[in-house]
Each structure stands twice: as structure tokens, then as C-alpha cells.
């Protein structure tokens, strides 16, 4: 993996390597506004998907959901909940830099459901892949997570990843498929470092194609995401995005590693973004009628 510095959504003035051949099927000329919008939005996709996976790490662990109860908190290895976790699942600490994990509190009524999990990152906690998280993720589980029809309601409270802050709620529902699969509806507000706010309403399907049977071991996790997002922002931009090739998220990479998103506005399709062939790097390619450009997903 490339060594990367922090600082997401700092958009470079030259997004380099334009093709000289025009592409058919795209409407509207390239403008600086379009270039910046797609580059920034691709970085936001990466952050939002990382935050969703982070909620999965905790709420899909049957041991934490069904075995542990209230008041389990420890920000450092060697005490309480995470002492048990490190003994039972030593690979879990590999997700967090120096093995320092967020506080976790689980509250329940008489040991049953619903259960509420609060994951607290405090004022800043670093993942092993370089993201810095702060704030809280609050997860309410209606039942054990792999029971068909069970729901997980995930709320982001004062939550930020690097320089991107997320507020709002998603609901993940276990489908009847044999493969671990969850339908997801999201209503998020994303705030960037420059004060821009972005409203995102999404319908996704998240399929665990590997790793769901090894609790708290991010090394073998692979998730495929499909669906659509409707976006509006404080600068007056409105558009929709459809995932035409499933996005792949692994448990150890900082970035989306594969997949294609198609962008449309009121005039039609204006861009696509290809996240690559599965390699773990911070590059994606953006295609419009003027050709293909390499963009950066973060630092």
C-alpha cells in the first residue's frame, strides 16, 4: 500500500492526464465545477463507505452482540471488553493503530433485544490504515444481526473521519439470501472542511462476499456494495449516482478498491468514476465526454 498523508478532500488544481479523444454517451462540456464535484464526491464515497464498514465491524460480531452486556468500556488493550476481545480475536487489534480501540458500551433490557451499542472514538483515534476518527457511532439492533429481517439502525453523532464529518442515520436490514446480505437506506449530511454541506439519500445492498464468518478479523473482509444515491449540496448542485459495477471494500485498505459509479443530472449522464481493478491505492479514473482523468481519493 502506498504511504499516504492525512487530509481528505483537498482538491488539487490540476487533476492531470486528460485524454485527447472525446467519449460518446456523455452530455455537457467539462467545467472546473464538474471536475471538482466528481473528484470531491468520489472522496466522500470512500469516507462514507469506510464509516459504514466501521459500524459493521462491531454490530456484526455475534460475540459482542449476544454475549457481552452493559458497561463494557476500555480505550486501551488490557481491560474490560477489549481484553476479552484481544484474547479471543487477536486480529481485531490490527484494525487500530497501536492496538488502541474506541470505547464500547452495550445497553440492553434483561439481556435481550433491542440492544444499543455506542462506539466512542473520543477526540481522535487512528485506524491502522491511516483514517482518524472522532465522535460516536450509535447502533440499535432489533435482533441478532444475521437473523432474516433483523435491523440495525446506525446513527452518526458528531462523527468525523479525517476532515469529513457525517451526521444522520442508516437502517440495515438482513435479507433472506443465503449469502450475508443487507439492504440499507441512508439519509446523511456530510460537512466538508470548507463548510460545504452535502445531503445524500441512498439505497444500497451490502453483500459480504468474504470474512463474515471470522469475527473481528478485518484481514479477510470483502464487501460488495450496489445501489443508488441522490445528492444535493449547499452550492446548488443536484445529481444522482448509480453503482453500475459493485464497489468493493476490504477490511484493511483505506480506499474503495474496485467498482464503477455513473453520474447523472437533469441533462443526463455527465461522468463515470472507476475505482480500479482491486489494487489498494488512492487512485480512481474519471471519464467524461472529454476523456479520462486520474483523480485522487485522499491522502
Name the predicted role of every residue range.
Residues 16-19:
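C-terminal motif of bacterial Sec signal peptides marking the signal peptidase cleavage site
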Residues 22-299:
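Low-complexity, intrinsically disordered segments exposed to solvent
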